[in-house]
Amino acid sequence: MSGRWHSYSSYLKSTYGKPVYRIGLDGGFSCPNRDKDGRGGCAFCDGTGSVAQYQRSSESGFFRDSSYTDEVANSLLPRAQSLSAQADRAEAFLRRRYKAELFSVYFQAFTNTYAPVEELERLYRAALEAVPGAVELIISTRPDTLGDDVLALLSSLRTEERAVWVELGLQSSNDETLRRIGRGHSAACWEDAVRRAKEAGLKVSSHVILGLPGEGREDYVRTALFVDKAGVDGIKIHNLHIPGGSRLAEEYREGVLTAPGMERELEDTELVLRHLSPGIVIQRLLADTPFHRLMAPRDFPDKFIFLTRLEERMTAYGTRQGDLL
C-alpha cells in the first residue's frame, strides 16, 4: 500500500507492471429496477445508467429489454458489432490521451448480468475478442441477478493472464436505507452473492454511497465493517450525487435532502477508509456524473483537489486505511 490508502493505480502497477486503463462498454442491457413493474429504478438513478466519457454521445441508445425474445436474439449480432466499435473508439481515445498499453474490458452501463446466460456469453466473448490481451474483465451488476450459471460462465472466462471481477452494488448495509432508495434487494442478498462469487474464483468489488437519506457516520462505519467482513477485493466509495431526473431530485427540490459538501465528505471518507482492511483496493473515492445531468452538489471541487486534500488530511492526523480495525 502506497500513501494513506491502497489505491487502484498502485494495485494495477504492482500486479501488471504498468498502468491499466478501463475500456467501458455498453452492452445494451436493462435493469430489473427499471423494467415493466413500474418501480422506476433506484432513487439516485436518472435512467441513463453509467456510461464511459468516450461513449456518452450514445447514451440510452439501446433497446433495453430483459426478456429473451426473437427481437433480442436477433439484436445480438448488432450488439456484438457495437461492442467492437465501442472498444475501437475507446482504445483509440485511451492510447491517444494516455499512451495506454494495457486494458481492462469493463461492462459498465446498467445491470450487465440481467439476461440469459447464452446471451451473456456471446456478448462477453465479443468484447474480449475486440480487446485482445485484456488483463481484466469487469462486470458491473446487482447481487440479485448473479445466478450460479452466470458465475460459472464468468469463472470460465478467467485465464492465467486475465482476471475476472464482479462489481456488486450495495450502497448501504442498512436494509431500511435500501428499501427507501428502492434497491430491490437486501444486504443479505449482497452478502450471499459475494460469497458465491468468491467461491467461483472471481474477484469482487462493491459500491457504497456516503450521504444517502437518513444515514450518518454510524451507518457508514457499519457498512464499511460489513463490506470488510464479506472479504471483498475492492471497493468504490461514492459521494452522493443527485441527478436531475432522479427521484432524489424531488426530495432535494423540496428541501428534505442535501448533498454533502467537500469538508463533510473528507471526514466521512477518511472514517470509512480507516474501517477497511489495508488489502482492499480502493477503486474510487468520488462519484462521476456528467455535469449537465447533475443537480447537486454543483460546487464540489474536482477529483484532484479532493484527493489531494484527503491525502493531506490523513497525513496531518497520522491516519491510514485500516488503522481502526
Segment roles from a protein language model:
Residues Y21-L25, F103-V105, L137-I139, V164-L168, ...:
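Hydrophobic faces of well-ordered beta-strands that scaffold small-molecule active sites
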Residues A109-T113, P143-T145, L170-N174, V208-G214, ...:
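Active-site-proximal loop/turn and secondary-structure-junction residues that shape catalytic pockets
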